[in-house]
């Protein structure tokens, strides 16, 4: 017997809804040709987000690249030189920024990274003027020093000197006048260590509108703790709702009544992780978990899970689900699904497709479910203490 297709449609709908709630984070990235803008973007977001194909022109000098499955978009100036060309770009950008500000938040520009290559060893007056005029558009502008030589945790003195010179200008940048020193690509001969990426992510999250912070956290690929916090909020909400569903004990045969709550949780967890995997594959992955238990419906799956893990549950016909059991099973499912998503965000598209089509997805889910069930009291206390 095949799995009831209705829940798959529900998951797709809920996942689309959760992604829509998260929205989209848009970054404008500026800098001379060759400063490493694309490398920096792709290091933070872990995918070919920045100009690797054809973008959508928004001005003569600027294109917009939106990832088809990650909640991020990049406005990229095509590499400018200072002087008259820079002035022209600024005029066109100002018009475009103002126009977008009148529309939906997902279409607006939320922050600017102005990238300066550390190897240039100078920051010109025209560059300072460009930054000042960008900030006058009422956008948070962050100066990013790129390709910074780092070895054994020590930054090259020339990069430190350039950063100090930029800071001394007191430009209206955020979160302060000091540039953020980064290296986004390892080169064993020149810059053998990454640096500054977490600092850039933290600074960007600090200065952007709160309404798009969830999109930034979902899209980025370097800080899993941010994703975990967001996913745990979804689990906490679902465990509370599940307990409410069973405030009056629910016959175990009616366990499917819990699934709308849990379905929403699963969708919210995947959205929080920003998994760049087609949602149809996520549906198939959870379907394989259910089918592997021998169940043909979600109700039977939940009932079987409760009978298996809850002491004294006995048989499907002789047990009722109380609030504590409902919230604990929901919590364990949430952590099991977190484990699957956490594996996915570390994978390439090819690795993710292979993982979702294998027993590995079921094994990861079940192992994390068992661990969460064993430690359910501790985990429940932890998610209650996590800040909103």
Model-found features: residue ranges?
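Conserved G1/Walker A P-loop phosphate-binding module
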Residues: 1-84, 267, 273-276, 329, ...
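Canonical P-loop GTPase G-domain recognition
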Residues: 2-4, 9, 139-142, 147-214
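Residue-level preference for well-ordered alpha-helical positions
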Residues: 42, 167-168, 270, 307
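Conserved protein kinase catalytic core
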Residues: 48, 82-85, 120-123, 152-153, ...
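Conserved C-terminal guanine-recognition region of P-loop GTPase G domains, centered on the G4
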Residues: 69, 91-176
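A domain-level signal for the structural core that forms small-molecule/cofactor-binding pockets
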Residues: 88
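Alpha-helical membrane association modules
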Residues: 190-201, 206, 210-388
């Amino acid at each position: 017997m095949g799995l009831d297709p209705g829940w798959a449609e529900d998951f797709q709908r809920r996942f689309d809804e959760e992604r829509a709630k998260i929205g989209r984070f848009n970054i404008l990235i500026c800098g001379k040709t060759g400063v490493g803008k694309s490398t920096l973007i792709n290091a933070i977001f872990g995918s070919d987000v920045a100009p690797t194909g054809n973008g959508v022109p928004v001005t003569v000098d600027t294109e917009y690249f939106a990832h088809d499955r990650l909640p991020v978009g990049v406005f990229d100036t095509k590499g400018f030189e200072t002087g008259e060309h820079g002035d022209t770009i600024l005029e066109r950008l100002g018009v475009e920024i103002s126009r977008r500000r009148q529309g939906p938040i997902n279409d607006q520009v939320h922050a600017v990274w102005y990238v300066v290559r550390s190897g240039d060893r100078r920051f010109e007056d025209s560059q300072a003027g460009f930054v000042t005029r960008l900030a006058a558009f009422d956008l948070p502008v962050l100066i990013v020093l790129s390709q910074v030589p780092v070895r054994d945790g020590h930054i090259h003195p020339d990069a430190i000197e350039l950063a100090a010179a930029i800071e001394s200008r007191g430009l209206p940048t955020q979160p302060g006048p000091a540039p953020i020193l980064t290296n986004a690509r390892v080169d064993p001969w020149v810059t053998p260590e990454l640096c500054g990426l977490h600092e850039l992510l933290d600074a960007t999250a600090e200065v952007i509108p709160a309404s798009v912070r969830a999109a930034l956290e979902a899209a980025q690929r370097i800080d899993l703790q941010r994703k975990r916090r967001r996913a745990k909020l979804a689990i906490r909400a679902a465990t509370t709702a599940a307990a409410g569903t069973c405030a009056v004990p629910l016959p175990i045969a009616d366990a499917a009544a819990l699934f709308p709550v849990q379905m929403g949780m699963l969708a919210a967890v995947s959205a929080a992780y920003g998994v760049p995997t087609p949602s149809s594959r996520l549906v198939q992955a959870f379907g394989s978990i259910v089918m592997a238990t021998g169940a043909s419906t979600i109700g039977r799956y939940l009932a079987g899970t409760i009978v298996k893990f809850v002491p004294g549950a006995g048989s499907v016909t002789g047990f009722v689900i109380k609030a504590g059991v409902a919230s604990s099973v929901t919590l364990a499912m949430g952590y099991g699904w977190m484990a699957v998503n956490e594996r996915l965000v570390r994978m390439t598209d090819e690795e993710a497709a292979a993982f979702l089509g294998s027993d590995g997805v079921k094994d990861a889910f079940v192992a994390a479910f068992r661990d969460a069930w064993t430690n359910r009291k501790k985990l429940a206390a932890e998610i209650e203490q996590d800040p909103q």
